[in-house]
Amino acid sequence: MIISLFVPFLAFSLLASAAANEFDIQSNYAKTEYKIAMRDGVKLYAAVYAPRGYTATLPILLTRTPYSASPYGPENYPKHLGPLGFAEEKFIFVVEDVRGRFMSEGDFVDVRPIKDVLDGPKDVDESTDTYDTIDWLVKNVPGNNGKVGIIGTSYGGYYATSALIRSHPALVAASPQAPMADLYRGDDAYHNGAFFLVANFSFYTGFVKQKNPVSTSEAPPFDYGTDDAYKFYLAMGPLADSDRLYLLNRNPYWTDMYRHTTEDSFWKVRNLLPHIKNVTPAVLVVGGWYDAEDLSGTLKTYQAIRRQSPTTVCRLIMGPWSHGGWNYGKGDKLGDIAFGNDTAEVLRDSEIHFFKQYLKDAPPVDQPPAFMFETGANEWKISEQWPPARTPQKLYLRAGGKLSFKSPAQEPDFDEYVSDPANPVPYMPHSPQDMVKEYMTADQHFVSNRKDVISYSTEPLTEDLTIAGPISPNLFVSTSGSDSDFDVKLIDAYPTDSQDPLAGYQQLVRGEPFRGKFRNSFTKPEAFTPGKVEEIRFDMPDVYHCFKKGHRIMLQVQSSWFPLTDRNPQTFTDIPNAKPSDFVPATEKIYHSSRTPSSIEFGVEPTALPNHETVTSR
């Protein structure tokens, strides 16, 4: 059943956002600053903003951040409180510097591990700090109604998720948005063993250890000496040289990121997912299909709650957004790809209703468990679960660059290319120093003439085909080296003979690297035997994408994606400490015979499903 969202439905959100841009915080809110003592005596800075002249009790909406609760000082006010439109709804807003950051005392630990069992009454982690903060707020902030919500994006989303663990009874609603969850398995640091280089280096040049309390960042702007990231990182050499040449061994957070190349205890204790159980607050998880940092964490947080705390009210909203993009834009496009409407407005309306229902006892609004934007079709859809019911399908890599639903029979056995670490495949035609978020939808034509990228394509589709959920490449490969990466990109190839301005566009739908030495274990890497055929299988993050009639489904396979990921020297070694002589060309072979049927597996959404409805926003 198709349900149209008429213009009046969005009018409230559009007006709310317009009003938010004009809403004066200082005229409408009174600010008070506090130092809140934790159970171990460490005091955390919190700024409390309460509506002026409001006599009724109000709920508290908390945000915890490592990025500064500024502006500091009782007379200094931010431009916004909470998401757009929230300030007009009258909450008591609290913004807190987490332990060891900016104006809070204590030692900061990057992604501080959560403990299932505390060592004593003064033992702390992010869960206890949130509990102690909430306990103090409800007992000491005037005019609160005893109900607390928490909201945060990215690192703030991680803190919002942490609040769900051994949560305070007053915490009744939480919205982790683009939350980190497992840094090694697909979030900010590593994807299938490959290090996300440009995102982490640019982040940790500014995110440094502080001598707190401090009101401003102590990191001066980093001088790259060039605006060409490809050139800069190629000249950097092995990652261990980054400390010596650029950061002078002064940032332990960066060093920890690149040195722990396997899924060792450093990463395992920082994996939040096993701890998210027995959740009592209602949860609204929010994420973007084009989140280059924490798409994996968003989906896994939702799935962990549904699996490990099945009675918890847990909703998921996924839109066509980059990392946190719903917070600062309309959500109408990303790069060259337009989505047909201002998608972020739909989210803001849902957010407000969610918190008003649980914090202010507002009448419940009929909102689905999963509210998902289908890219390609540019439609919002609602479902009882994510992923929805779907039919498994495989596309097989075939000779001649073909991609087919039919498995190979007798045909040439493999395709091959030479991967050279001295000339890695770029992830964008030109890459500035910060990671380019638009790479998630970018046209892949710019690598079509490279001999180290192999493309496979279906015939034009005779009807629309929607892929929903995770994608699983299953490749049979060999290498002349002792280690190699195998990066897979799923692409929507637009017709070349249409009048569409994007005619011939090869839109990236999902891409993911895989470091070959981890094909059997992320804790015990294994060298390749040169020339030996090996099977590599891995999961790529979920998509919800409609390949339209007349489009082609394309797959590209390559062995570098630079400087999005660090270079694999193609010699089995500890990559951060690789020597220049370890970086060698390697011949990579992708096999597609009846004995070695390389393929990509995914779920196809049926055209009509019970409990699955299409919502067209106008």
Residue map of PLM features:
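N-terminal cap/lid segment of alpha/beta-hydrolase-fold proteins
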Residues: 21-56, 457-463, 528
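Conserved alpha/beta-hydrolase "acid-adjacent" motif
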Residues: 292-299
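Cap/lid segment of the alpha/beta-hydrolase catalytic domain
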Residues: 52-140, 189, 327-339, 450, ...
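Alpha/beta-hydrolase fold nucleophile elbow
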Residues: 142-154
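Accessory cap/linker subdomain of secreted extracellular hydrolases
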Residues: 80, 88, 110-123, 127, ...
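Glycine-rich nucleophile elbow surrounding the catalytic serine of serine-hydrolase chemistry
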Residues: 152-162
